[in-house]
Amino acid sequence: MKFSFTKNREGQKGFSILEMMLATVILLVGLVAIAQLVPASILLNYRNRTDSSALVFAQRELDQMLDQPLNAPGSPPQFTDALANICYLGDPASPNTVQGSPVVVINNQALIDFTAATVANFSFLYLDLTDPSGVTYDVRWAVIITGNGSSISAKRFILGVRQQGGNGYFQPVTLDTMVER
């Protein structure tokens, strides 16, 4: 006859110290990782705001240029923008050439060359009074007139805006558009 001895063991309750230490380490690693993401997200949010400000300003300035007639009066054709800057619109006597700020082509995209010196009446500095850090934007543009000298059929505007000052480095914003009859 076989006797089986069974001993009633009480079930374990709670966690061992090793399990608690492992859980604590995992929790701390997660908290440190999240803590590092907060400053990075704040910086990216600031940069996105700055890029958006430059783009909105570039769009407003380009809209004012596009609102001018193709055969604008004056020699050379010009207008005064909403910020009281005199803006040249290109000389019809020099068709099919880049007039104004120098342009470079990178990856088949025409961009304003901000390494070159500014060209009078084809550039200005804009101080953003709504920005508490006092950011200044360097605004430059080039115009390419298509026509035969006396008759203008189209104008291509390449406008670039670059932030000067502030925290960090920001790529310039470039808008390229054409208006024709």
What positions do the PLM features span?
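Aliphatic-rich helix starts adjacent to a transmembrane/signal segment
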Residues: 15-59
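Exposed boundary/loop context
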Residues: 4-7, 23, 170
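N-terminal leader/signal peptides at the extreme start of proteins
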Residues: 1-15
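Detector for methionine-enriched segments
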Residues: 1, 20-21, 65, 178
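Low-complexity, Gly/Pro-rich coil/beta segments used as flexible assembly/activation regions
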Residues: 49-52, 56-181
